[in-house]
Every structure is written in structure tokens, then in C-alpha cells.
Amino acid sequence: MPKLEIYKNLFLDKIGKNFTNLEISELLEPFKAEFDGFDESSGKIKIEFNDTNRPDLWSYLGLARQIKTYFFGEMPYYDFFSKKGDFKKFYGEILVDGKMSQIRPFIFGFLAKGLIINDKMLETLIQFQEKLCQNYGQKRRRIAMGMYNSNFIKFPISYIASSPNHKFVPFGMDYELSLLEINEKHPKGLEYSHIIKNFDKFPLLLDDNNNVVSYPPIINSNNIGSLKVGDTDLFVEVTGIDFEATLLALSIAACDFYDMGFEILPVKTVFREPFNLDFKELVCPYYFQEEVEFNVENINRLLGSNLTLERICLSLKKMGVNSYSKDFKNYIVPPFYRNDFLHEVDVIEDVMIGEGLSSFNPELPKAFAVGRLSPLEEFSRNVRNLMVGMGFQEMIYNYMGSKKDFIDRMNINDQNFLKVSNPMTENYEYIRASIIPNLLKSESVSSNFPYPHKIFEIGKVALKNLDTTEGTSTFTNLAFLMSGKEISFNEINSIVATLFYYLNIEINLIESKTTFYINGRGADIVIEGFNIGGFGEISPYVLNNFGIFIPCSVFEVNINKLMSRS
């Protein structure tokens, strides 16, 4: 969970009132944040958040904004946001190469002017950038932010798909390296190059003088890409693979810079062919959030309350959320810096927090029951202990993913996969039917760790099944992966034999026709005439799709079927 260290004097100055440490702790409670101490020598407060839904709070500016709104009724407003059909005047352009649509497609930016950066401000900006990129940005994979002295940049800026051999001086060095060399030698390249290394070309940001601004999301240019104390004019950009996440990160940054005292000047992004978007250009910061409908009866039913519409609107306003009624329906308008309202339940949560938890009377549960582990869970725990005992490390993955990872890279068809009809992003478009793609994706970013690699997961998978009422079936699977120069079919066969020996289950093996195995090096596992899974060596074609350059063998079985025949 995100942790902040903020200067107490800056924090209180921004709130406009003085508070003791105990009072600050109480101010933080509604926002799922905890006061974690005060260092008198540095003058810093330590704060830890208990969830990641509100990245707008991960700076003293965002926290102060929310506290002033909640406790003192000061609703912020920002007049520099463009909206659909109402673009603001822009002061620079970013031209996006069409080839970036398949690499890291989105980039948006703004200019910030009129304030001289001092030591504490610079430290605050760097911490904000780090928290946003590491947590909300999923260690720069989802989004990454860059900040520059705009006086050294000539607009328009070009965001291009560059040759890996393009050279520039990266931040922290005094000599040129190619993009490929940065991936292999620079500390930031070693840490983050896995995000883009599987592409033939890499992202590059150039100004109109053909000077390198940065190599996102890896490293800035040493000549342009460093902020210093005394700088006054800044260019801020965010790149990413998720349209809304990239826009939101930029919006949060713009609001924070404005609250710090900067003037915000919009910048236009122009997308060139073959981008398949509903728009060709966007002036940012841009308000993209959708209104969410809510129902008074639903709110009172879930909260066990009897709130009026007026009271609900006041509670929402304390959270910075405006609301209105039209045609006998009620809607909320998310703030510029928030996009965490995915469902009416999220609105209800804000009403609850705005109302204050202490205003709800505690009630004892009306039903009581004693739980126990299900037979499936007991069996799974036994299997888990065996895997750990054989030297495997357990992984935990998301059940949803992209067509690219689950289907295309695996060289299989999608006939058994469940597709989400209205996905928020194509990265979470399918529900997994196998754990193996998750294991391979982990392996693809683990080449810097000593071999052999031995990882496993016990988790849910879902498949189409037209014989059921729902049209789907959900199972618990066990899957593991072994990788290394010496890993072969014989190695994994030995592990499989050991596993089933300790489970006291007899199995039969038949040659597998699975397309992602090397021909002749895969086996299906059969018990009492039923196929429950298989194992084998992954084909070089599939390994290459994932950017893996060392032999891998995988295993996967259906634990439900396995347990029923044990």
C-alpha cells in the first residue's frame, strides 16, 4: 500500500489551519489513511494508505484538498480542463507516430509555469511521481510520468517508434548509449526494460530540434529531462497503455501543480494513422469521466439508513462530488481528479464516508454459523504444501487478462474462453481458461533472476459449458512452470511422478496434441479414462511470443476432477 512522507508545515499551510499530530491522525481516518509517525529532525509526517482506489490523495496537496473539502466545505474547481466539444486553447503539440498504437499508444501532457521550484517542492514532486508510477502505474507498465524544464524543449514534440540503435545521453550518465544498451546497462533499463523489450521498436520522445527528451517509460535525457531547484517553466507528460488511466494520472498531476501555485497551460496530442480511436486529437488536461446514476432507495437499503436526497447530496459534496437530478433520476459528477466510480456501490461508499461512520448505529449479526474448510480447500492445501516442499514458489494472478496473452501468444483458439461484453480495457477482456499464460508472463519478466525457475499457482479458471444453466463452468486448477537450460520433458515428468506418488493417485500418460507443446514432448494425464490435464515442453514459437529465450516446461491439472478420483 502507498506510504507517504510529507513536510508537516507544507501540509498544514495548504490546509490553512494548525493541528496537533493526534488531530491530523483523526483528519486522515475518513480517507483510509493512517498517521504513522512524525520525525522531528526532518519535520516530516509519515502516512500509510489502506487501499489504492484514490491515487489523487498520494501527495500532501491531494490530501489537503480532500481535507479542506470534507471538513471545511471548500470545493476546488479547475478551469483548465477541456471537455468533449469544448477544447481549451493549447500552447504546444505532441505528435504521435501511428506505429506507437501497438507499443505504448497514449501520451498526454501540459505546461506548468510561474513558480520557482525550491528544495522541498522538488522533493515533493519526485515523491508524487514515484508513488503514482509505482503504485497506480504498476511499476511504470500501466502509466509513467516525465517532468522537464520546458525552456529546453522546442514544440511540437514527436512521440515515435524508434530503432533500438538510436543513441542519446541518458539521465545520470555523460556518454551516449543506444536504446538497446540502455536496456542492458543502465540501472533503470535493467529495472524497467521488460515493459517494452519484446517490441521491434521502442518509444522515444523528440522535440522539434530532434533532441531526445526521454525514452519512456525507462529514462529521461540527461540534457533535457532533469528538473532542478530554480526551474520555473515545466513540461509534464504521462505515457501509458490504458487510455483512462493515462488521462487520470495527468489530471491528478495538473490539479496538484495548480494547487502548488503553477499556472496550467494545455497541450494538444495529435494521433496519426493507423490509430483506431474515436478522436484524432485531444487537448489536455481533459475531463473524460462519466456520470453515474444513483438511487436513494438503494443507498438507504445498503446503509440501513433513512437519508433524504438532500442529505445524500451534502454527504457526496464533502467527498468533492457534485450531484444533480434530471427526469426523476439522480446522478453524480466525478471530480476532475477521480475515476473510481465504476458502479452505484462506489457512490454509496462515498455517501457512507461523507455521512461519517460514527453516524451509523452498530448492529449485531442476525445470523450465526460456524465455518470450516471445504474438502476442495483441504485437498488444495495438501497439494500446495507438496509443491512448496518440492522447491516451487507460489504465485497469485488476476483471473482476467487480454486476448493477446491468453490466446494469441499461446497459439490457440478462443472457443473455450469467456469474453467480457463491456470491458473497461482490452487488458482485462477475457476470463482465463488456463493458468499457464500467467506463468509464462511471469517468466518473461524474470530473466535477470538465477535459474532454474520453479513457480506454481492454485487458482480458478472458467470455461464455456453450454450444458449448464449459466453456460459456464468454474474449476480450481493447479499449474506449475519450470525453466532453465537443463529443463526438459524428463525433468518435469519426474516432478509429476513425485506429486502423484505423494497424492497416492495412479495416472496414465498419452501423447498430447496440445499446440503450445513441442511435438512429441507433451503428455495428457488420464485417470480412469478421464483427461484431467497435461504437461510438456513449451514450443519455441510460443516462447518467442512471450519474449522468453530459455527452455520452459509446464504442467496443469483440474483439481476438482483430480480430487473426485483420488
UniProtKB/Swiss-Prot annotation:
It holds the Pfam family B5. It is found in: Cytoplasm. Mg(2+) binds at D340, D346, E349, D350. GO terms for biological process: phenylalanyl-tRNA aminoacylation. Its main location: cytoplasm. One of its GO terms (cellular component) is phenylalanine-tRNA ligase complex. The keyword Glycoprotein does not apply. Keywords: Aminoacyl-tRNA synthetase, ATP-binding, Cytoplasm, Ligase, Magnesium, Metal-binding, Nucleotide-binding, Protein biosynthesis. One of its GO terms (molecular function) is magnesium ion binding. CDD domains: PheRS_beta_core. Residues 287-362 form the B5 domain. Its cofactor is Mg(2+). Its EC number is 6.1.1.20. It catalyses: tRNA(Phe) + L-phenylalanine + ATP = L-phenylalanyl-tRNA(Phe) + AMP + diphosphate + H(+). InterPro entries: aa-tRNA-synth_II/BPL/LPL, B3/B4_tRNA-bd, DNA-bd_dom_put_sf, Phe-tRNA-ligase_IIc_bsu, Phe-tRNA-synth_IIc_bsu_arc_euk, Phe-tRNA_synthase-like_B3/B4, Phe_tRNA_ligase_beta2_arc, PheRS_beta_core. This is Phenylalanine--tRNA ligase beta subunit. It comes from Borreliella burgdorferi (strain ATCC 35210 / DSM 4680 / CIP 102532 / B31).
